[in-house]
Amino acid sequence: MRGTVRTRGTVRTRGTVRTRDMLRAAIAGAGAAAPVLAIAILGVAVITPAGHDAGRLAFRLASAIRILPRQSAAAARGRPFSGTPAVGALFTTSGGHLADHFCTASVVHSRGGDLLLTAAHCLTGKPIGRGGIVFVPAYHDGQSPYGAWRITAVFVDSAWSSRHDPDDDVAFLRAGRPGSQIEQATGAERLGVGLPPQQVRVIGYPDAAARPITCRAPARGFGPRQLVFDCDGYADGTSGGPFLAHVSKATGRGTVIGVIGGYQQGGDTPDVSYSIRFLANVAALYETASRG
């Protein structure tokens, strides 16, 4: 998770644990009564059937291992920059002043010109209403070039609110300021639903940094309803950061096809990030938020 309660850095065995679970499932499917042969794969002791059952098990093991995220020995790394207008940081407030930024959000085009997009887990336990959370677009180095916008409403899917389903880790927020619309001030990203995995630019605000980071790399499929993105530096605070496809060189805006969140609430290590895939559930939630 990349919100304030995430323990990034303390869990470093995620890949090993996931592999072990997959190996156990593959072994169970091979038949418990078969003769066995002890082998070792990825440092995990495995008991596998001897004879021709070993061939079927080897296929299951290879399939399990292949679906794990790939990481390059020379992985890309996010670089700090001064920000872009339609992406910003979510802050808590204290005494009417900005306190700490804890997650990332982006402005998305809507009929009312007032919707933001982030990860649902970012809002868990946060004080919505009465100015408890504000959005600061293009925040950097203590500067708020487009001001601070109060969050007045939050929209999440019922599957998230009832059981925190990782495939529904997305939220739309309404941002308000008397007499103005945020989209008129900052411009907006487009919402992309049902699009395939592709090259993206991901922007996020690490909570210990004064500037956002940006990185371009492929977003790959991770199961039927998730995406995975390999780039280092996406630590606490980057949850909700948009996966931007087709970014315009002229405006810096693009099409949001995901946000950091989903599996492991965005990832247990800074070099691998996840997002849900934007499918019919996100389209329906967007329509609800647009009407609400």
What are these regions (language model features)?
Residues 96-97, 112-113, 122-125, 141-143, ...:
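Solvent-exposed loop/turn segments at secondary-structure junctions
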